[in-house]
Every structure is written in structure tokens, then in C-alpha cells.
Amino acid sequence: MTLIAQTPTQTIRGKAVDSESQSPLVGVKVEVKIASGEQFRALSDVDGNFELSKVPIGKHQVVATFAMYETKTVTAELSSGKELILTISLSELINKQAEVSVVGRRKGSVLNEMAMLSAQQFSVEETNRYPGSRMDPARMASNFAGVQGSDDSRNDIVIRGNSPLGVVWKMEGIDLPNPSHFAISGSTGGPVSIINNKFLGNSDFFMSAFPAEYGNSTSGVFDLKVRNGNDKRHEFTGQFGFLGTEMMAEGPMNKKGTASYLIMGRYSTLSIFQKIGIQIGTDAVPVYGDGAFKFNWKLKNGGNLALFGLGGASNIAIEISKQKEYTKEFYGEGDRDQYFGTAMGVVGLNYKKSLNEKTYITSTLAISHENQHANHNYLVRSLDTLSSGAIEIKVDTSYALMAYTFNFTKYSGFVSINHKISKQHLIKVGINMDLITMQQLDSGLVDIGVPNDFKRRWDYNGACVLIQPFVQWKWRISDKMDFTAGVHSQYFSLSNSLSIAEPRIGWKYRMNGNQSIFAGGGMHSQMQPLYTYTYNKYGTQDKPIYHNKNMDFMRSVHTGIGYEKFFKKGISIRTEAYYQYLYKVPVTIAPSSFSMINLGSSFSRVFADSLENTGTGVNYGLEITIQKYFDKNFFFLFSGTLYNSEYKGSDGVTRNTSYNGKYVANLLAGKEFKLGKNNVIGLGIKVTRAGGKKYGYVDVNATNQNYDLTFLDSAFNTRQFKDYFRLDLKISWRLNTAKMTHEIGLDLVNLLGTRNILGLTYAPSLNPAESSAPGYQPTAEKTQLGFLPIFYYKIDFRRATDH
């Protein structure tokens, strides 16, 4: 084979395995054919390993073929700074023919063999390419049909009308604490993700009706896969930009290539951007840092041992007392200084081994910790007229309003066994176990207007366990038809809640003409945020009353049916209809509109009165996705959803949930232009349109009495803000040299500066003439993020002595 002159080259290598047993496949033919007609071929060895050397950089199709297995096609993007390491999973054919060639599964098909519907694979490549995603898996997932972000300031996602509280993050089989900076206790999102996409391999995202191994969720699951570091040469990545400065290093830990490391860290301070006049959405400067690592060892017995970790910390001070200009538009509450910080971390040990050609075991032990702490000072302010005639705000006095510290430590264990009974039957059994210790302390003023009269709202030290066993079975009826069935169970000791059997089923039929139909359903259950069980509203410090400690699981039944067709040139269309019934939703005992179904997407905790599991909810909708995967330097994605999301509180009234925007549509497109052999210019555009947020009428008297925004209960979610619209644009330039790849990018979020309304906020006027005027309301509209330019410079390079 000849090398194309002056074009940088790179290595493609990896491992070919059976998709169900994970055992290595010997003799798999791996082939790359480039545009010039030149071909690169390799055969996998006894351990399933293959290597293609000196492949020209660029976008290529990697095709893997093996007798009695489906053909698999993988799109590979090669750069000169990093080797491409792939794991290619092949599915065994049912038909007993000597050799059969079958069109491989579509790009983006999920890694989990048990998933038949409502699932999507996402890659690092996609999180980088989609405008507005900020290299964040959650924000990237908001482009999928049925998914939308809750607001611009956070990465919480709403899946089919469900609260973000129902989203579960998993890594190597164990459940993670909220992997976001500035995360409110019990939530699943935040302003900035701790998860760095450079740390991940291809991963799965599930939207309800998921396989039996996933539990404690009525909404969705991110099943994250951590990639291994390069085990043959040392590679480095550096990046500087709006979201922080980061470094990553990876490489072998011995000369045999049996051990590797991957270490990365990031630190961000946005004060420099604020000083030069770039708006970052707030006058307060958020400070955060995070890191991750993975050490991987290939053991002599054929097993694999990995030590991994992830963590981050963040702090912010929102000091309204420093603001002198008279305006109602404050970030946060306009009558208090707020100091808030969070931290999370997880360290785990994962072991994987093929016991034989048909049986595979994986297990993980991990410890994780999360902390949230805050204190607020109440401000008594007035207006001061200066000698110049200007009016400014002065602080007459301030005093402590509230403070809290929550700590949760979790000891987790996970084990699962895959056994391939035959070509047609696969069974998987396993269990997740969590031991959780809690230390919760919180005090707040009984009456905001009366200093130093505090009540201990949380004062709890204790422990609980969450146990989730499962079993699932896959029946490959033929090469065209699959059926899955499973059962998930769940027990939570704090509330003594038990869901003894949650059945899950899925079915898929692949028809002629590259099209398929699929259907499935399942029962699911979910515990509430831990702090809601230990709230002490009515008791004293000496005799606390945990009035919600016996709160049961919220439950749901979710069903779906869909159709998918693939056309030439990488174009596909997919549509899915779903129906979800939620029951045993926690609502107040006293008749009201309150329901836990509406919470989980704000910077506030919930202070719930006595709750009972009598609420209900209904979500149903129709989704469509038209997509062209990145091929021949172009991609596009259209996703649209029409949906309805309603609930009933304890007052028996059917209302819109807080996430019932009725519709959401996304259109993304991107094009890369090659300039010579080594330069690539990338352009991407994204347009989002969605129904506005629901809200209600303000109870002015109660708001003034409580010093906090209070809505009329009877009119909750009866109004709607105007529709949401946002245009994002991304521009990038990439240069490949012999051993380096340089990339400069600019992500222009909300390019048009559209003023989308986030909600109302409590903003009392300090002017007596205004506050006494007829029709006065102590509120202000709070808008979402304005125009935000996010730039970065990234460099990938390898050590000079590596080839």
C-alpha cells in the first residue's frame, strides 16, 4: 500500500467482540476504503485485536465482516494528534448458512443489546459537533425527539414531559450523584456539567420503557461508558476557553501495553471575561474545578481491572448588597445576599472477565460523596437621593436569614452476569446495592421580618439502603425479529418501600427495505430526593417530626410503538408514539395543586407539607426524527415532538404540569469544508422552537407577607409565557500536522439575543409611590440567557518519541 504524499496519517486499532458474550472474535476482517480507492485491511488476532496503520486522516467507514455474523460499519474520524481506538461488537446470525452478508445496524444504535425502543447512542463526536451543546452530554441529548432543556441556565432535561428529578446518571453500572456544578440537593442537573466528554466513550441514553437493569427512574437514564487511555503511546490534550482551562494525558503504564492511564483536570474562573465586558449571564462570578481519571489493567487470567474516578467543586457569591443601581432585575432574589457551594466525587473499581465463550461477568465497587452548603443574609434596603439628584440603593441593615449543609456518602456495589445460552437466547442477571449515609443540618428564620428567631428545619443523621435486583432475557426469534423480557425489583429502607416486580418487555421486527417496527412497555418506580424524607416542619429540635419519612415510590407504566426506515446516503426517519401513566405521585394531604411531578428544574429546594402517594399524571405524545449522519462532510437532524403532560393534585383538578409546553422542534445542520489536505473549516447551525413555560397568577398579599413569590393555588399553571426561540451558530477551524491537531472554535449561543422568559421572580419595589399604586405586583420577569459567545482553543499531540 502506498501513502498519499504529504497527507498526515494515523492508526486505527481496537478489538472485535461478540456483542452478547463480549468474548473476542478471531479472524474478523476489518477494512477501510478511502476516497482515492486505496484499501487498508487487517484481521483480528486470537485476542480480537486488530490494527490498521498509516491511514490518511479524515472521515472513513470502517467495515468489519465475519462468517456467521452481521456486518458492522463504523464511521471513523481520524486526526493526526490522537490514535483512534475502537471496540467493534458483532451480532451472531441465526440462519445456518455458510456465509451471510447483512447490512449492519444503523449508526447510533445503542450499545445495550436489550434495548428495543426509546433509546439512543451518543458519542463524543456529536457533543462536539452540535451547536449550543457546550460539550455537555445532557445539553446534547436535548436535541433528541422527546427531550428538551428546562432552561438556558441549567442542563436539566425534560423527557416526554417528566420532571428532571427522574433522570438517572450511571457510570460502570453504579448510580452517580448529580454530576453538575452548583447542583441543588436532589436535582439531576446544573449550570455546568462535571462530566467532560473527552473522558467518555460512546454511551447510551434511554427515554423511559428501558430494560430491566435500569431502575429508580420514571423518566430517563444516561448509561455512561468511560474509555480507556491509549495503551501504546502517550497522548496529550490541552484546551483553553470560556468554560475553563483543561489538560488531559493518557498513555501506557508499561512496555507490554497491558496497562494504561487517563487523567484530566479543568479549572474555570470567569472574572477575566467579566472585566473585558463579556456578559456571562450573571454579575456573580462562578468558580469551579473538576477532574477525572481511569487506570486500566489487562490481567493475566484474561480479566480486566479498572480504577476510575470523577469529581468537582464549585462556589458562587451573589451579593445584591453591592448593587447600587435602582432596578428590579436582579440575578437571584432581590432582597438577600446568597453564598452557595457544592462538591461531588466518586471513586470506583471495576472488574470484567469472560468466564468462557458464552459467559461474561462485570462488577463494580464504588464510594461517592456529595455536599451542598449555603447561607443567605437578608437585606433591609431603602432608596437614597444623592446630592446630584441620582437615586441609589442603600442597605440599612442585614442579618442572617438561613444556612444549611447537606452531606451524603454512598457505598455502591454492582454485579451482573451475561450468559449466551445459544445463538437465540441471552440472559442477564444482576443487582445494584447502595448504602447511603446522610448528615443534614438546616436552620431558617421563622419570620423573615424578625431577626435571630430560627427554626431547625433539618437535623438528621442516619443511613439507608437501596437494593435493585434484576433479570432480563433476550430471544432472537430470527435474524429479523428480537424479543426481550425482564423484571426489576426495588427496595428502599428509609421509607420501607418495596416494588417487588416491575415487568419490562420489548419487541423489534426488521422488515425488507431497511425498515423496522418496534414496541415495548414497562413498569417503573422512583424514590424522591433524600432530603424530602427528613424535613422537619412541625417538630422541634429536641423532638423532630419527619412527616414525609414514609413516602412511597412514585410509579409509572410506560408504553411505546415506533417505526424506522433507512435510506441511502445515511438518511433515516424514525417516529415513535408513547403513553405514560404515573400514579402514587406524592401530593399534599390537604387539598392543593402541589405535586412532586412539577419539581426538579430550579435552584430551590422543596419545603413540602405532609405528603401522601395519591397523585396521578399522564404523558402522551408523538415524536419524529429525520437525520443524516455525518457523511461526505455534511449532517443534519430534525427532531419534533407534539405532546401533552397533565397531572392531578390532591384537590382532584386536572392541570398542566410545569413542563407541558405542548411542542418542541429542533433543526441542526453542519458542513465541513476542506482547505487543502490538512485544514478543515466547520460550520454548524441550530434552531430551536418550543412552547412557553407554564405559570399562574401571583397572590400579591401572600407574596408580600412571605417575602417570596407565591402563586394562587387555584390558578396554578393556567397561564403560559410566549414560545421559546433560539438560534445557535458554531464555527471551527482544524489543522492537522504530523503529530499535532489544532482546533479553534466559536459557539455563538442565542445569536439573535432573543429574550426568552424564564419565569417570574420576587422583586419588591423600594419606591413607596410604586408599591402603593393600583395593580402593583412585587414581581419582575426573569429572562433566560442572552447572547453568549463561547470560544475555545484545543490541541491534541503525542510525545515526540512515539510513532
Residue ranges of each PLM-predicted region?
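Periplasm-facing N-terminal accessory domains of Gram-negative outer-membrane beta-barrel systems
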Residues: 4-99, 103
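Periplasmic N-terminal accessory/gating domains of Gram-negative outer-membrane beta-barrel systems
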Residues: 70, 77-85, 99-210, 221, ...
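Surface-exposed extracellular loop regions of Gram-negative outer-membrane beta-barrel proteins
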Residues: 180, 321-322, 326, 444, ...
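Transmembrane beta-barrel wall of Gram-negative outer-membrane proteins
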Residues: 241-267, 280-319, 339-367, 421-422, ...
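Flexible loop and strand-edge segments within Gram-negative outer membrane beta-barrel domains
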Residues: 282, 304-354, 369-394, 398-407, ...
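Outer membrane beta-barrel strand-and-loop segments of large Gram-negative receptors
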Residues: 402, 410-412, 457-462, 468, ...
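Gram-negative outer-membrane beta-barrel transporters
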Residues: 579-581, 601-691
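C-terminal beta-signal and adjacent terminal beta-strands/loops
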Residues: 636, 687-707, 724-726, 733-803
